[in-house]
């Protein structure tokens, strides 16, 4: 049995978003073929993602300087706990699906907050004298990224958000990557052929993901 984490970052309702619509079709087909797998769904706009703020940094600095964790305030402790829950959730899974859309040639801020959360030290990586090192077990992990670019900036965005997420996931130990890029997220402003081509590829990926 595999554990799949399905992460969306799109403020639109599903019927107004190509990425959410196609992503859900992928998920339905995946579950039809893999009913025994466990799926966890995370909506970065709906679910309150803890950002790495000054309270969080203060806790890290104090722990690094040798201070007792018991002196951390309840508010600081709650923030750290929320970050660790997200990182542990990521660590426990072995398949990841990210459904995102473009905002100013990159991701919405909520997605970067999530990447910061899963990248905190201890659950997913640790610092060594030479560099940071992934702490995920050696088993095969794979990811699928469904991303809607702005139609007039399609080429440039392939080099920004998609490459960034691939680099982060590779560092964390995810070695198998797939990406399906859409030219725009608006269902009413797309050619039927381009949409069906993306849909066909996602359904094909669901058979072997």
Annotate each predicted stretch with a short phrase.
Residues 28, 155-209:
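Glycine-rich phosphate/pyrophosphate-binding loop and the adjoining helix
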Residues 11-14, 150-153, 186-188:
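Short histidine/acidic/glycine/proline-rich micro-motifs that form metal-
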Residues 3, 38, 141-142, 176:
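Residues at the starts of beta-strands that form the adenosine-phosphate
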Residues 27, 31, 119, 123, ...:
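Hydrophobic/aromatic-lined pockets within catalytic cores
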């Amino acid at each position: 049995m595999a554990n799949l984490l399905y992460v969306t970052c799109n403020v639109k309702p599903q019927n107004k978003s190509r990425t959410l619509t196609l992503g859900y079709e992928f998920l339905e087909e995946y579950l039809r073929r893999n009913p025994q797998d466990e799926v966890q769904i995370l909506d970065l706009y709906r679910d309150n993602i803890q950002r790495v703020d000054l309270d969080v940094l203060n806790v890290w600095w104090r722990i690094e300087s040798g201070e007792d964790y018991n002196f951390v305030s309840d508010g600081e402790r709650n923030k750290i706990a929320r970050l660790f829950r997200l990182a542990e959730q990521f660590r426990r899974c072995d398949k990841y699906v990210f459904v995102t859309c473009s905002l100013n040639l990159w991701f919405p801020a909520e997605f970067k907050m999530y990447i910061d959360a899963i990248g905190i030290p201890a659950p997913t990586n640790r610092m060594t004298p030479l560099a940071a090192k992934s702490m995920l077990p050696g088993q095969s992990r794979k990811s699928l990224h469904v991303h809607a670019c702005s139609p007039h900036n399609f080429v440039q965005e392939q080099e920004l958000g998609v490459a960034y997420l691939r680099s982060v996931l590779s560092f964390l130990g995810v070695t198998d990557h797939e990406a399906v890029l859409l030219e725009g997220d608006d269902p009413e402003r797309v050619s039927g052929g381009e949409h069906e081509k993306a849909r066909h590829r996602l359904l094909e990926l669901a058979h072997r993901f």
